Structure formats: structure tokens, C-alpha cells
């Protein structure tokens, strides 16, 4: 998975927890590199990475079930520090001679730990006799400890909530230190990697930038690279990093499908040409895309048309350039993790970016993926390192199919223009109110519904516009943003007065789940 060797690495063995990525983010935040490896290939990962410490994740499985996941014995034979979390604690105990039973009292949500013994993991954090909030999510629990372990903290329903074998540097907890609901959890993980494992850590985006540039130069040599640039954070940072490495050997192609936000394509082109002197081709293919999309109402059909046309247009333009051996792609570490899944085991096929699909195979090109070790928040930090304007770094997520999936029902050029204007006004009001950075994602949706209205002395029969805004940490779950009514009234009034074709505005108060963030 790695592009370059990392001398100080933490191996995270994934047993299928939904929050394993949060463990990795906490380790990275402490300045230490880590990789997630599914338990099926953990032994191979251990030998490949040569880690300085190991963390065992949670899991929906039960150690009581036949064939449930286990950590490879090489981890416990290595003499390395090991930190088990939830299921990781249970399998550690089961494998080392302890006992795990199904709990009579399931424990989900907030719990409170009582510190019963001093422990190196508590250094500078918790003191003997203190009480601390943690987040539990378990049914099974440890009922007998392996030899050498002792209890260092308990909760009302988990007498072995925090255990340690300090001689072997084994630590294990029944709660989840990686989630925000355990306020001191990130510090506990930092103490494990720094004070227990003795890793000082040199994982910074400044250091990563230098290593990535070197790796790109080594991979590409004097060959040409093409990059599909959307103006989003991932493709923008990837393009700048590659440009820093190989300069004019990189050509970026921005395919304008006519489904972008107001002035978006022009702004992206202007920024990259004026500030970075980057070779960028702006291909206006809007007529081609919208021509095929007009009248199409099924959202999956829309996506397929857009994906197919993007590949066709990009391939045509790339062939005109000729001689490119490499295709740049903004693959992130979560994409890599998903492709090497808990359920499916290791896979040699990395998940393709939704826009460039099968292009590498079709065009006989090799991939350059300079961001494939990074999480989204790290990409943003790297973007700042590279001098990308904050207006680009902090942009809300925007779907690949663009406005096509914010226009439910059949698409027409007229409806797209109405939506584009309404969306621009809405985002303008959000920025004026100083709310943009507090919101994960905000956008307008043009509904396939017309209602009666009165404007001046006349009757109108025009479209309904829905406004959407959500708060989220990772997009997996989301809550609608709680605007005050004065803001909503102001935004609605502007849209109705300034956008011909809309006479009613509503606000979407659906959370995820049960709804999704996008409407299609």
C-alpha cells in the first residue's frame, strides 16, 4: 500500500469495526504513521510494515463464535507493545489464556470509568481515583484475565474495562478511545504510541510533501502525466503535488459537463493558470452531456450517462495530446481501505475514481496516486502546504454528477440554469452570515413540482426549491443544520425575487439516516 517506507509505523489490525478509520486518524494526529490491515492479511502486513506497535480494533463479531477473527500469533510473539480496543481486548484475552463470556448487561453509549491503579497510559492525563467519561459499545465482556494482566480501571458494567500487562506492554480497553464521545481517548492513543511504544513521530504533511515529490519523480521519470481536474480538493492537491515534482510533464484536463456550480469551471481554470502556471485544458462538453441527459429522470441512469460520457470525452482529449504514460488519480486512503475490505480480504484492484473508471486499462496507462496514503483532513493540510487558497481547501463536497442529481426528475437546460442561480444565492447568503465553515455541505435542489403563487398582481405557477444543509464529521451520518428562521426567510426571499422560475422555497430537515445527504 505504501509508496515509501516508514521507519516508525503502527499496524492497526481491522476486525471489521465501523470506526477503525478513526483509530488511524488519532494515531496520525499524534504525528505517527499507521496502516490499517484486515485481520485475514495481518501476518503478511506485520512482516511487510515491520511496525513498532500494534493496535487491535473492535468488531461486530463475537470471540465466542466458531471461526471468529483472531490476531496472528506473530504479534504476541514479537515483544511489541499491543493495544486492544473492545473486540481487540476480548480476542487478546481469549488468545492469551483469559476468558470471555456473553454479557448479561449490554453496554452501549456513555459510561464512566473509575481509575483504580496508576498506569503509564494515564501519564499526564488521569490520576488514581479519578472518574472519566468513555463510550461503550459491547455485548460480550472479559470475565477472567490472562496471566500477567491486572485491572487499572472499571465501569459499572465492565469490571475489566481497562487492563494492562505492563511487563509485556500489553494494554486493552473495553471502551472506544477513538471516538469523540471519549473525551480523553485521543490522548490515551497518543500516550500509547509515544510513551509506551517510544515512537517520536515524524508524520507531518511537510515531510510527506517532500517524500511524495521524490516518489513521483522516481516513478514518472521523464514521461508525461495527465490528470482529470475537477476543482475539488483531492484532484487539485494531487495536480499541484505532481506539478511540483515534474512541472510541464503534467497536463490537466477539466471536462466541463455543464453540471457545475455557477462560474465554477471558469474560476478553477483562472486559479490554476494564473497562480500555478499549470498546463490546463478546459473542454466545454456541456452540449454533449446535457443533450444526452435531457428528459432522463432515473438517477442511476443519469449517473451512468455522465460516467460514460466523461470517459469518452477524457479519452478523446488525452489521445489528442499523445504520448502520456501516466494517469493521475486522487485516490485517498479510505478508498484503499475499502478495496481491501474486512469481508472480502485482500484485493489487488484498487477502487476506481468515479470519474476515470476504466481509463488506465483502456488507454494502457499507469496510475500515479500521490494521495493514496492520506485521509481527507490530511489532504486539506497538504493543500495549505502547497499554497492552495482556503476558498478551495474548505469547499463543501460536490458530487461527480453535479447538478444532475440535485434536479430530481427530467433534466432540461432551463431547469439547470434555474437551479444554478438559486444555489449561488443560497451559498452567498451562507457566506455573508459567516456560516459556511460551520456547515459540512449546503446546496439547493430544484424539485419536479410546480405550485401556485402570487407575484405582483399576477398568478404564477413555478418550481419549488428545497434548501439543504447538514453538519457531519465524515459524511457517514449527518444532521440537518439548525438555521434561525430569519436566515431562512432572507435566503428564500432573495431566491424567489431574483430567480425567475421559482415561487416557493422549503427547507429539508431530514437527518442521515434515514435520508441521504444528496436527494439522488
Curated annotation (Swiss-Prot):
Residue ranges occupied by any GMPS ATP-PPase domain in the UniProt entry: 203-395
Pfam families: GATase (PF00117), GMP_synt_C (PF00958), NAD_synthase (PF02540)
Molecular-function annotations in GO: ATP binding; GMP synthase activity
Ranges of residues in domain Glutamine amidotransferase type-1: 9-202
Root EC class: ligase
Catalysed reaction equations from the record: XMP + L-glutamine + ATP + H2O = GMP + L-glutamate + AMP + diphosphate + 2 H(+)
Binding, ATP: 230-236
Presence of keyword rRNA-binding: no
Keyword Secreted: no
Active site (record annotation): 86 (nucleophile), 176, 178
Cited function: Catalyzes the synthesis of GMP from XMP.
Protein name: GMP synthase [glutamine-hydrolyzing]
Organism: Rhizobium meliloti (strain 1021) (Ensifer meliloti)
Gene label: guaA
Amino acid at each position: 500500500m505504501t509508496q515509501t517506507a516508514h521507519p516508525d509505523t503502527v499496524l492497526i489490525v481491522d476486525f471489521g469495526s465501523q470506526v477503525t478509520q478513526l483509530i488511524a486518524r488519532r494515531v496520525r494526529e499524534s504525528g505517527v504513521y499507521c496502516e490499517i490491515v484486515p485481520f485475514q492479511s495481518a501476518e503478511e502486513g506485520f512482516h511487510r510494515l515491520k511496525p513498532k506497535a500494534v493496535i487491535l480494533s473492535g468488531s461486530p463479531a463475537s470471540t465466542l463464535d466458531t471461526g471468529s477473527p483472531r490476531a496472528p500469533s506473530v504479534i504476541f510473539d514479537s515483544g511489541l507493545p499491543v493495544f486492544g480496543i473492545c473486540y481487540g481486548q476480548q480476542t487478546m484475552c481469549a488468545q492469551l489464556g483469559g476468558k470471555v463470556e456473553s454479557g448479561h448487561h449490554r453496554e452501549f453509549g456513555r459510561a464512566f470509568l473509575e481509575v483504580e491503579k496508576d498506569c503509564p497510559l494515564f501519564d499526564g492525563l488521569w490520576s488514581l481515583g479519578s472518574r472519566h467519561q468513555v463510550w461503550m459499545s459491547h455485548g460480550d465482556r472479559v470475565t477472567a484475565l490472562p496471566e500477567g494482566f491486572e485491572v487499572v480501571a472499571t465501569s459499572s458494567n465492565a469490571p475489566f474495562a481497562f487492563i494492562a500487562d505492563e511487563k509485556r506492554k500489553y494494554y486493552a480497553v473495553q471502551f472506544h478511545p477513538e471516538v469523540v464521545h471519549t473525551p480523553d481517548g485521543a490522548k490515551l492513543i497518543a500516550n500509547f504510541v509515544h510513551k509506551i511504544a517510544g515512537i517520536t513521530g515524524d508524520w507531518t504533511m511537510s515531510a510527506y510533501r517532500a517524500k511524495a515529490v521524490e516518489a513521483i519523480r522516481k516513478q514518472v521519470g521523464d514521461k508525461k502525466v495527465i490528470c482529470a481536474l475537477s476543482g475539488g480538493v483531492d484532484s487539485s492537491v494531487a495536480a499541484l503535488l505532481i506539478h511540483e515534482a515534474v512541472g510541464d510533464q503534467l497536463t490537466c484536463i477539466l471536462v466541463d459537463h455543464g453540471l457545475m456550480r455557477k462560474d465554477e469551471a471558469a474560476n478553477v481554470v483562472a486559479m490554476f493558470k494564473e497562480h500555478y502556471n499549470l498546463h490546463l485544458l478546459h473542454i466545454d462538453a456541456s452540449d454533449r452531456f446535457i443533450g444526452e441527459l435531457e428528459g432522463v429522470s432515473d438517477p442511476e441512469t443519469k449517473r451512468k450517462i455522465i460516467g460514460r460520457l466523461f470517459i469518452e470525452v477524457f479519452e478523446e482529449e488525452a489521445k489528442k495530446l499523445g504520448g502520456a504514460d501516466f494517469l493521475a488519480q486522487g485516490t485517498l486512503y479510505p478508498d484503499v481501505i475499502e478495496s481491501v475490505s474486512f469481508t472480502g480480504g485482500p484485493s489487488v484492484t484498487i477502487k476506481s475514481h468515479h470519474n476515470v473508471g476504466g481509463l488506465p486499462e483502456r488507454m494502457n496507462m499507469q496510475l500515479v496516486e500521490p494521495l493514496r496514503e492520506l485521509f481527507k483532513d490530511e489532504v486539506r493540510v497538504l493543500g495549505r502546504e502547497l499554497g492552495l487558497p482556503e476558498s478551495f481547501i474548505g469547499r463543501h463536497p460536490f458530487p461527480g454528477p453535479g447538478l444532475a442529481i440535485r434536479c430530481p426528475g427530467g433534466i432540461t437546460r432551463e431547469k439547470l440554469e434555474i437551479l444554478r442561480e438559486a444555489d449561488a444565492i443560497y451559498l452567498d447568503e451562507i457566506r455573508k452570515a459567516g456560516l459556511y465553515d460551520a456547515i459540512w455541505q449546503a446546496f439547493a435542489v430544484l424539485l419536479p413540482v410546480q405550485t401556485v403563487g402570487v407575484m405582483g398582481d399576477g398568478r404564477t405557477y413555478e418550481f419549488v426549491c428545497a434548501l439543504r444543509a447538514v453538519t457531519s464529521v465524515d459524511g457517514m451520518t449527518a444532521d440537518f443544520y439548525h438555521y434561525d428562521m430569519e436566515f431562512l426567510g432572507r435566503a428564500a426571499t432573495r431566491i424567489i425575487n431574483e430567480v425567475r422560475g421559482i415561487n416557493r422555497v422549503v427547507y429539508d430537515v431530514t437527518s442521515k439516516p434515514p435520508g441521504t445527504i444528496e436527494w439522488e
